Amino acid sequence: MINPGDNAQEELQEALILMSEGDTLLIKSGYYLFEDGLSLDVDNVTIIGEGLDKTILDFKNQQSGAQGFLVTSNKVTLKDFAILDAKGDALKVIGSKGINMINLRTEWTGGPKSTNGAYGFYPVESEDVLIDGCVAIGASDAGIYVGQSKNIIVRNSIAQYNVAGIEIENSYYADVYNNLASHNTGGILIFDLPDLPQQGGHHIRVFDNKSIDNDTDNFAPEGNIVGEVPRGTGIIIMANSDVEVFNNEMSGNGTVNLSIVSYSDETDDPNYYPHPRRIQVHNNIYLSLIHI
């Protein structure tokens, strides 16, 4: 168990290193101000706080580490805490088989800025990914991002004031449902890009979501692909196959509610297919236009 205090950072990182498989670590309610990033590389463990508004890990004074919290192990559950103002990505997960992120919050508290970290939730090259009941605010790329992964669920979550609210990129077999994406530049993005180890994104379902009032100016750093997303976009599907979009509400998006597009930049990747295929859109509620 970790309590707030002057030595909380050292105690928490030591506890993360010394955990054994099957352990649960409780981070008690309170405010924790950290100067260094945290990391976890132990399989089959649970890290739990006492609420996403009660256990607060604040990285505004972070001096080292490319992210607030880095996970590189399997069968991990993270639950009931917040990560604020990380120097880079808030919560990054690499190469995990079985990662559960439940009732977590990532936020940059100074409002939308290009100097904010790129990603709130950032699992990549992972399998069996669950993001459930989470909140992502203020990321300069995507609040909730899953990339080059497979067997994914993103549900019951809120993404606001990010460039992209929720983004599934170069991934296979994802269900995105019962989420609220609002006041982002773009609400929900389903992208496939060239020159990555895993591409040909396919079998994505986007349903029972609200992608509404996405009205924040694009604040992505220059050169970032999401910097091309126009303010006021509900859902974009780019270069994926076998995508189904249904039972969503899309409204109050000033540019377009639903856009289905090809990847338009030049690429030398011989294995990349830039056009969307087998896209189904049905039973949605929306205002303004569909652009194909």
Where are these regions (language model features)?
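Acidic Gly/Asp/Thr-rich repetitive segments characteristic of extracellular carbohydrate-active
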Residues: 1-26
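Right-handed parallel beta-helix/beta-spiral solenoid domain characteristic of secreted/periplasmic
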Residues: 2-10, 44-88, 110
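Short, T/G/N/S-enriched strand-turn elements that build extracellular solenoid repeat scaffolds
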Residues: 12-18, 33-42, 47, 95, ...
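Parallel beta-helix/beta-solenoid
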Residues: 20, 42-43, 52, 72-74, ...
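Extracellular beta-strand/beta-solenoid scaffold signature
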Residues: 35, 59-69, 85-92, 113-123, ...
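Conserved small/polar residues in nucleotide/adenosyl-binding loops
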Residues: 59, 290-292
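Acidic, glycine-rich loop-and-beta core segments that form the ion-binding/anion-interacting portion
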Residues: 172-190, 194-210
